[in-house]
């Protein structure tokens, strides 16, 4: 999935197996309808693991190589992102490409039973659209949300949903849809998707940092999630980024919660002298109003400070800055870089980061990527 199309020779070298062993394994997968042979594209090498140097195979010099790749239309999956106000859902193929439109339903009642009913409807909507387009019926559902999930099944902490007790969401959805269902942290899902199908492919380590309704962070090493029991409690949100910044609800002065929408709205209200929402701030920032622009620059410097802290401690190859409010980072990119440079050694390598456009469909796709990862084991 990560590197296809890829030759058997290259695959054998990556895995440290003999070509004979790889041929036997891939023959079984071809027979099972999981992968297929395809001509290798000329003059265009696909992504490979960082630092991997392919050894020359003189025995096959001059012969056209045949590549192997996952059969994209062999399976389909449904992915969903649960937000505080709505659920977004898409269907994807076996290589994580979105194959339907993004279906959205508003959450008017956040009780688990009502949310499951919405999930069932969205699963049906995505499945029907995929099947009408000739794709196979989805074989699994992946659902992501901001919170703490145990064993991919039970939601024990979901602050935006206000659930007062653990919810066995996986069991409830499986019973409602008849499909295997996994429940995942939303930030973890983004980083898994990036390492399977996106900018994290082949890298030794990769970070996703998000800000919007909250502040989130997830890290992979060698393509695998770095996990600990407490990681999804929003721990990155209370790292100091500005000693003169506003206090969060926990009383911390200048912690990373100042990057959240509510904190930005409160700070902007104080600056302009009357109550303002985050949407008011965003509108004024887009209109280049001086007071909003000043807060954009301050916010981006704070974000750069957080990025530098993460880069210095986790030492990732790349950081993806995402979230519904990540557009702010594009408005103040120079201040973001200044914040990074202020807390980065002058001789250290520049921090490699990217800021993709926000789209809830991509968050839903990321949940589907978790389902794919679970499906293939």
What do the predicted segments below correspond to?
Residues 67, 77-81, 138-142, 206-210, ...:
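Short glycine-aspartate micro-motif
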Residues 98-205, 331-342:
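Glycine-rich phosphate-binding loop and adjoining helix at the ATP-binding site
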Residues 1-103, 110-132, 136, 177, ...:
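ATP-binding/phosphotransfer module of carbohydrate and carboxylate kinases, centering on a glycine-rich
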Residues 101-103, 110-115, 164-165, 169-283:
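Glycine/GP-enriched mid-protein hinge/lid loop-to-helix segment characteristic of carbohydrate kinases
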Residues 146-149, 212-214, 325-326:
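Short glycine-rich anion-binding loops that position phosphate/pyrophosphate groups of nucleotides
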């Amino acid at each position: 999935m990560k590197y296809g199309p890829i030759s058997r020779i290259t695959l054998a070298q990556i895995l440290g197996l003999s070509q004979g062993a790889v041929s036997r394994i891939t023959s079984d997968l071809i027979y099972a309808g999981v992968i297929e042979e395809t001509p290798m594209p000329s003059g265009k090498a696909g992504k490979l693991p960082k630092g991997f140097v392919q050894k020359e195979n003189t025995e096959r010099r001059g012969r056209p190589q045949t590549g192997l790749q996952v059969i994209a239309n062999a399976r389909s999956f449904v992915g969903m992102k649960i937000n505080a106000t709505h659920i977004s859902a898409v269907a994807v193929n076996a290589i994580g490409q979105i194959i339907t439109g993004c279906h959205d339903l508003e959450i008017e009642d956040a009780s688990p039973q009502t949310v499951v009913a919405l999930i069932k409807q969205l699963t049906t909507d995505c499945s029907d659209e995929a099947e009408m387009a000739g794709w196979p019926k989805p074989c699994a559902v992946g659902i992501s949300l901001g919170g703490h999930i145990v064993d991919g099944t039970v939601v024990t902490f979901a602050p935006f949903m206000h659930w007062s007790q653990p919810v066995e969401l996986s069991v409830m959805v499986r019973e409602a849809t008849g499909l295997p269902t996994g429940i995942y942290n939303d930030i973890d899902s983004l980083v898994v998707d990036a390492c399977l199908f996106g900018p994290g492919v082949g890298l030794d380590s990769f970070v996703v940092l998000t800000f919007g309704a909250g502040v989130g962070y997830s890290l992979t090493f060698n393509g695998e999630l770095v996990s600990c029991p407490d990681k999804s409690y929003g721990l990155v949100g209370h790292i100091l980024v500005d000693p003169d910044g506003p206090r969060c609800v926990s009383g911390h002065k200048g912690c990373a919660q100042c990057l959240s929408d509510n904190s930005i709205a409160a700070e902007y209200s104080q600056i302009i002298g009357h109550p303002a929402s985050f949407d008011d701030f965003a509108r004024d920032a887009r209109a280049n109003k001086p007071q909003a622009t000043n807060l954009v620059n301050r916010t981006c410097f704070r974000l750069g400070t957080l990025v530098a802290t993460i880069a210095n401690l986790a030492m990732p190859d790349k950081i993806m800055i995402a979230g519904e409010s990540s557009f702010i980072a594009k408005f103040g990119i120079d201040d973001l870089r200044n914040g990074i440079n202020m807390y980065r050694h002058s001789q250290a390598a520049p921090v490699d980061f990217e800021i993709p456009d926000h789209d809830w469909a991509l968050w839903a796709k990321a949940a589907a990527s978790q389902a794919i990862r679970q499906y293939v084991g």
